[in-house]
Amino acid sequence: MIGQVALDVPRPAEDRGWNGSLVIMSGAAGRIVTALELTRLSMAFGAIADLWLIVMLARADPRYAFMPVYALPLPVSLACAAIAAIGLFAFGASLNDLLDARHDRAFAPQRPLPAGRIRGGQALVVALASLLASLAASVIFGTGGLILAVIVAGLLLLYNAAAKHVPAAGLVTIGVASAATMMIPNDQFTFTLPAWLTMTHATAIATLVYVLDGKRPQITARAGVLAGIGWIFWSMLLIGAGVARSPETGYWPAGSAWWAPVLPVVATALFGIVVVRKVRRAKSPSIAAEKVARYGALWQALYAAMWLFACGLHMAGIALGAFAGVGFLAMTVLKEILGSSGRPLEWRG
């Protein structure tokens, strides 16, 4: 979830794990670890899975035979989708740290910039290189993919520079950025329900993390209502556009069973249960926020797997399910190595 990369959830001091690894690492290994922490790539698995889902669904539907994603070799499509997702994810994370450097010196001194493990100029190079890589990968999917990537980059810049200080705008911006990123491989995709779920998931996670972490300004009743109105507007636009563009062929992908929506609903319910358990067992609200952000980023891969199963693409669903397992393992390992969590938008938004 690209939008989530903008969410900066500081790791609580009581749960930072072993930080000695960052002290003894030097040379290439130390630079790699610092880059991983700066870009929060351990949480990019969900964002990659989002784009891979659209690649798989588009290639299984002959209605998109005119699109580059349909004609390109599968390895090329998957590689370009992954680069686009990782690039935008890393761009948002690096941009967040650059613009929040002063704040992090006081409240998150373990981050790479305030800790002095990377200079501001180097972080800027990482951000720009990540953005250029994502744009280069997106253009492979056509002009529409490139335009969407530029829009997402603009939304990430808007969020980090201003919108995150206005909850009514920032929370929705995270969701919209996540949905837009997902559509990069096929901007003509009419089955927009997965993108809507991604937008809703990212917005909900961003809201919960914002509240648990005690961010300021607080979400007032007025801000909550405005954010809700924004979510409704973009939901109607996203789903309505998909329905309007597929009046003859149908909204649902061919071959989908009548019970297809049940699987994503089950995945959503399971995530709700996981969130409740993690929040209740957390030692502090900030630890709870970190866990919600981490599991929220991972869960996108599970959603993608469930959508593939629902649409009859069982082997692809198994593959993305395994990818989600790898993502969880990677996040767990890197969490211990880095001693702090990385978090987007939380493209996660």
Please place each PLM-identified region on the residue numbering.
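Helix N-cap and loop-to-helix transition residues
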Residues: P73-L74, R119, G142, T220, ...
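Multi-pass membrane catalytic core of lipid/isoprenoid biosynthesis enzymes
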Residues: C80-A85, A101-L156, N160, V172-G175, ...
